UniProtKB/Swiss-Prot annotation:
This is Norrin. Disulfide bonds join C39-C96, C55-C110, C65-C126, C69-C128. Keywords: Disulfide bond, Secreted, Signal, Wnt signaling pathway. Activates the canonical Wnt signaling pathway through FZD4 and LRP5 coreceptor. Plays a central role in retinal vascularization by acting as a ligand for FZD4 that signals via stabilizing beta-catenin (CTNNB1) and activating LEF/TCF-mediated transcriptional programs. Acts in concert with TSPAN12 to activate FZD4 independently of the Wnt-dependent activation of FZD4, suggesting the existence of a Wnt-independent signaling that also promote accumulation the beta-catenin (CTNNB1). May be involved in a pathway that regulates neural cell differentiation and proliferation. InterPro entries: Cys_knot_C (IPR006207), Cystine-knot_cytokine (IPR029034), DAN (IPR004133), Norrie_dis (IPR003064). Residues 39-132 form the CTCK domain.
Length: 133
């Protein structure tokens, strides 16, 4: 009898491991690190110029968050005992978004000796978080 309980426990743990439903940080981080499409920061270069004034443009290194989140998106119907369903579904989804960023500025030289300052957020890290509706 004891062997059957042990075998059943081992089978359940194996099933949970296959489904990815474990609490092990090491296992889940390994799964995330091995996914090349995971949510992460990507660098790119873009030209910054003023939309109205004649200023010399500058090439700037920027970063964006891009990739997939491991959590599944889901929508379920809500059951109500009212004839009016204000919100007929409960939805949950996760998006790849900036986690930390810093404010940066650059100066553009414009005609007539004028200088304009452009500001932007430079993304330092990305993570998955619940999407807002």
């Amino acid at each position: 009898m004891r062997n059957h309980v042990l075998a059943a426990s081992f089978s359940m743990l194996s099933l949970l491991a296959l489904m990815g439903d474990t609490d092990s940080k090491t296992e889940s981080s390994f799964m995330m690190d091995s996914d090349p499409q995971r949510c992460m920061r990507h660098h790119y270069v873009d030209s910054i110029s003023h939309p109205l004034y004649k200023c010399s443009s500058k090439m700037v290194l920027l970063a964006r968050c891009e990739g997939h989140c491991s959590q599944a998106s889901r929508s379920e119907p809500l059951v109500s005992f009212s004839t009016v369903l204000k919100q007929p579904f409960r939805s949950s989804c996760h998006c790849c978004r900036p986690q930390t960023s810093k404010l940066k500025a650059l100066r553009l030289r414009c005609s007539g000796g004028m200088r304009l300052t452009a500001t932007y957020r430079y993304i330092l890290s990305c993570h998955c978080e619940e999407c807002s509706s």
